[in-house]
């Protein structure tokens, strides 16, 4: 099994209500791809490289899970439209 197949096989073990997971080869590296199932929202796709040594390591399933969860967190945080730290955020009236 080549590295891309190994990553794809591991990702098939995960099923999420909101997100789709896949992997691709891009510029000579393997990337984790995370997308919303509802593509109509027009939000970006998240890409994260996976290091070859991680794929080859005997603990790959655990490392992949940690990386997947970290990337999911980052992806969801990137979806904020406004935060208190936003420079252009005008104060909002409480509802």
Q: PLM features: residue spans?
A:
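Negatively charged, low-complexity tracts enriched in Asp/Glu with abundant Ser/Thr
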Residues: 1-25, 54-70, 74, 78, ...
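Short, charged early-sequence alpha-helical segments and their helix-coil boundaries
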Residues: 42-55
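Polar/charged, Gly/Pro-rich intrinsically disordered segments
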Residues: 44-46, 82-95
